Every structure is written in C-alpha cells, then in structure tokens.
Amino acid sequence: MKKISLFVYDFDGTLVDTFEDIANSVNRTLIEMNLQSLGPETIRQNIGSGVVNLMTHCLAGSGCNNIETAVSLFRKDYNHHLLDQTKLYPNGREIVEHFSNKKNTILSNKPIAFIEKILEAMNFLPSFDSILGGDSLDEQKPNPKGLQFLMKKYNCPAEKVLMIGDNAIDVETGKHAGVITCGVTYGLGDTNSLRDSKPNFLIDNLSDLKSLFN
C-alpha cells in the first residue's frame, strides 16, 4: 500500500453524480435561446472543462455563437436545480471519512459556489480541508496551478499526493504536477480516453482506494 498525505478529488463524475441536473439545465438554456435541445451523450462528453467550454461545445453547429448569454442563462438555471437529481456516488462519503486523518480536497473546473452549495446540502462540506473551483484561480485543469497550490498549501511532496478523477483531464493535470494519478471508470468521462491517459491506478469504485493507499 502506498502512503498518501493529500487526496485531491475531482467533483462532477468522481465524488458526485451531477449529470442529470447539468444536462437538464443545458437543454432548458438551449430552449430558452430558441435552439434545439441535445441528447444526453452529446452533453456528457463536454462536461469537465468548465461552464464556458460546456456551453461553447453545446452551441457548436447551432448557428448561434452567443456564448456569454448561454453561460449566463445556464448559471442562472442550474443554480435553481443543483440538487434535483444530484447524488453522491457509492462510497463517496465513506471513503472521505475513511481518510479523515489525511488532507481531503477538491479540485474542479466547476464554479466553486455550485460545489459548496451541493456539498452543504448534503452535509458533506465540513469533510473537506480545501476546495478549488474553476473560478478560484486564473487557470483551470489541465493546467496544474490549482494542484500545485494545494501541494504548497499543505507542504506536501508530489509522491504523497493522489489526484482522483473520471476524466483524462484529471490525469493530465496530475501528470503535469508529477503526482500519483487514479482514474475512476464509473463517472462522466469517456472510459477509453481515461485509459489512454494512463493513470497510475484505475478503479471501478471509490472503496477500492482503501486497498491501495494508506
């Protein structure tokens, strides 16, 4: 077993299943803009790179390039539907509690206000030592700036840091910072792309972390 001091979790698709609420808000936004709604898989493949990238890709081919309006409408709608169907993935709470003697953090491209509201409603917010969202710093994943910020904050060397995520972007971020990476296969990210990114570990359930790290 490998000793880890700092756990860095992605949010959407890793700790929390937010897909239905995100997809529904995307489609309500498109309909409000008099555009055609999209199928779930089209939306799914664009989650993970932040709201601006999400809406940019969802407008592609629509003939509309008003990204700013789309982002604003999405944020407004999603803010009212954060918890309609959103839920923790199996063993999400349990694994964070299992490693409560370590530093447990979140590094996501999702706006931090959304993350905190969801976790607060789930009574899960106090379990995390730090949370960085997509608007916390001037760079987002796969830029390693957020990860390096957390490493410096907790004075933690790369070999004691684990980056956990469902997307190749998370693995890429971890590799840029030289930390250990762990992909999760159950999330929103494309599994083939995740495998191709060659994380150090690949798990099917968060509970698998118990047998790999201490």
Where are these regions (language model features)?
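Helix-loop "lid/cap" segments that line or gate small-molecule binding pockets
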Residues: T29-L30, G50-C64, I118, L150-M151
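Asp-based, Mg2+/Mn2+-dependent phosphohydrolase catalytic module
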Residues: M1-S5, E116-N214
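An amphipathic alpha-helix signature
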Residues: A23, N27, P40, R44, ...
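Metal-dependent phosphoesterase signature
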Residues: T56-E97
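Short helix-capping segments at alpha-helix termini
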Residues: I31-Q36, S62-N66, N123-S127, N155-C156
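Short, acidic loop-to-helix structural element flanking the phosphoryl-transfer center
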Residues: I4, H80-I106, I112-E116, P144
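Active-site neighborhood of HAD-like aspartate-dependent phosphohydrolases
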Residues: M1-Q45
